[in-house]
Swiss-Prot record:
<dbReference type="Pfam" id="PF00266">
    <property type="entry name" value="Aminotran_5"/>
</dbReference>
<keyword id="KW-0663">Pyridoxal phosphate</keyword>
<feature type="binding site">
    <location>
        <position position="102"/>
    </location>
    <ligand>
        <name>pyridoxal 5'-phosphate</name>
    </ligand>
</feature>
<dbReference type="GO" id="GO:0004648">
    <property type="term" value="F:O-phospho-L-serine:2-oxoglutarate aminotransferase activity"/>
</dbReference>
<comment type="function">
    <text>Catalyzes the reversible conversion of 3-phosphohydroxypyruvate to phosphoserine and of 3-hydroxy-2-oxo-4-phosphonooxybutanoate to phosphohydroxythreonine.</text>
</comment>
<dbReference type="GO" id="GO:0005737">
    <property type="term" value="C:cytoplasm"/>
</dbReference>
<dbReference type="InterPro" id="IPR020578">
    <property type="entry name" value="Aminotrans_V_PyrdxlP_BS"/>
</dbReference>
<dbReference type="InterPro" id="IPR022278">
    <property type="entry name" value="Pser_aminoTfrase"/>
</dbReference>
<dbReference type="InterPro" id="IPR015421">
    <property type="entry name" value="PyrdxlP-dep_Trfase_major"/>
</dbReference>
<feature type="modified residue" description="N6-(pyridoxal phosphate)lysine">
    <location>
        <position position="198"/>
    </location>
</feature>
<feature type="binding site">
    <location>
        <position position="197"/>
    </location>
    <ligand>
        <name>pyridoxal 5'-phosphate</name>
    </ligand>
</feature>
<dbReference type="InterPro" id="IPR000192">
    <property type="entry name" value="Aminotrans_V_dom"/>
</dbReference>
<keyword id="KW-0718">Serine biosynthesis</keyword>
<comment type="pathway">
    <text>Cofactor biosynthesis; pyridoxine 5'-phosphate biosynthesis; pyridoxine 5'-phosphate from D-erythrose 4-phosphate: step 3/5.</text>
</comment>
<dbReference type="GO" id="GO:0006564">
    <property type="term" value="P:L-serine biosynthetic process"/>
</dbReference>
<keyword id="KW-0963">Cytoplasm</keyword>
<feature type="binding site">
    <location>
        <position position="174"/>
    </location>
    <ligand>
        <name>pyridoxal 5'-phosphate</name>
    </ligand>
</feature>
Length: 362
């Protein structure tokens, strides 16, 4: 079978080594004669999976001891509700920074539970889309927290600055598409959440990192399944968790540790992004309309100068083993999502195809 490179934005490509191990263990996991999908989540075998996954995740991100790690349901959209329901406390407003599609989606959901103070950080610089630097973000004095999204998958926009708003500002961040791709200082955040289906594992699992002093503030109307305190008190097993997704994510964490951890991923991700953006920037045939300072390393949208060639580009790239390159319907064009599991070899295959396609159709 020819090598296939999956550039989907999520559910995304998983490491080949992880898939092979899961395949080998599918019908006989740990010598039990059953699949990990069939064992009790409260049995000692799966408890070990859960404990190892949390330990490895903490190691990868150097999560401080005063932070809890929760393995949840509901995806990023579930957390759009969970964040205000858990950490508003007795306040009624929160600061939300709008830099793209997913930040705006979080704002829309938050309006059900509080009055968001929305700061529009989107700007245009020399005709390119960009984000105002954090020093220009206007925050209110009475907000329970400040929320932003460091990486916008649809817009291809990244905010790589580390927040530094003082110890009194609780920062909540949607890291769904950039978690584990580069080192982060967890201590600068009150809440970090990430849907698993991009850089962690398969869809169905969501990881939350929450500072322990923020527990115990949930609104009385908060569903138990979204209550951080209840999840923490029950070891993330208030109800039956997505065990297979948890197991696979644990395998991904071990794969990451065996391959140099987050620091090594950071280097490789930079190489991949430079290679792909380099081909785009050195061509009049392709274009990207995001300012270099805010370009995402995870999601690279690009357009062809002649959109009439879009269909042919997608057909030929698919035939060449380069899958899921169609851009989001909101933006159009193409989009290459190059998360941790995408090897440099895959990006090289894409850029070689792009150069050859331009040669034939430019």
């Amino acid at each position: 079978m020819a090598q296939i490179f999956n550039f989907s934005s999520g559910p995304a490509m998983l490491p080949v080594e992880v898939l092979k191990q899961a395949q080998q263990e599918l019908r006989d996991w740990n010598g039990l004669g059953t699949s990990v999908m069939e064992v009790s989540h409260r049995g000692k075998e799966f408890i070990q999976v859960a404990e190892e996954a949390e330990k490895d995740f903490r190691d990868l991100l150097n999560v401080p001891s005063n932070y809890k790690v929760l393995f949840c349901h509901g995806g990023g959209r579930g957390q759009f509700a969970a964040v205000p329901l858990n950490i508003l406390g007795d306040k009624t407003t929160a600061d939300y920074v709008d830099a793209g599609y997913w930040a705006a989606s979080a704002i829309k959901e938050a309006k059900k539970y509080c009055t968001p103070n929305v700061f529009d950080a989107k700007v245009t610089v020399d005709g390119l889309r960009a984000v105002k630097p954090m020093r220009e973000w206007q925050l209110s004095d009475n907000a329970a927290y400040m929320h932003y999204c460091p990486n916008e998958t649809i817009d291809g926009i990244a905010i790589d600055e580390t927040p530094d708003f003082g110890k009194d500002v609780v920062v909540a961040a949607d890291f769904s598409s950039t978690i584990l791709s580069r080192p982060i200082d967890v201590s600068r955040y009150g809440v970090i959440y990430a849907g698993a289906q991009k850089n962690i594992g398969p869809a169905g699992l969501t990881i939350v990192i929450v500072r322990e002093d923020l527990l115990g503030k949930a609104n009385v109307a908060c569903p138990s399944i979204l209550d951080y305190s209840i999840l923490n008190d029950n070891g993330s097993m208030f109800n039956t968790p997505p065990t297979f997704a948890w197991y696979l994510s644990g395998l991904v964490f071990k794969w990451l540790k065996a391959n140099g951890g987050v620091a090594e991923m950071d280097k490789i991700n930079q190489q991949k992004a430079e290679l792909l953006y380099g081909v785009i920037d050195n061509s009049d045939f392709y274009r990207n309309d995001v300012a270099k300072a805010n370009r995402s390393r995870m999601n690279v949208p690009f357009q062809l100068a002649d959109s009439a060639l879009d269909k042919l580009f997608l057909e030929e790239s698919f035939a060449a083993g380069l899958h899921a390159l169609k851009g989001h319907r909101v933006v159009g064009g193409m989009r290459a999502s190059i998360y941790n599991a995408m090897p440099l070899e895959g990006v090289k295959a894409l850029t070689d195809f792009m150069v050859e396609f331009e040669r034939r159709h430019g």
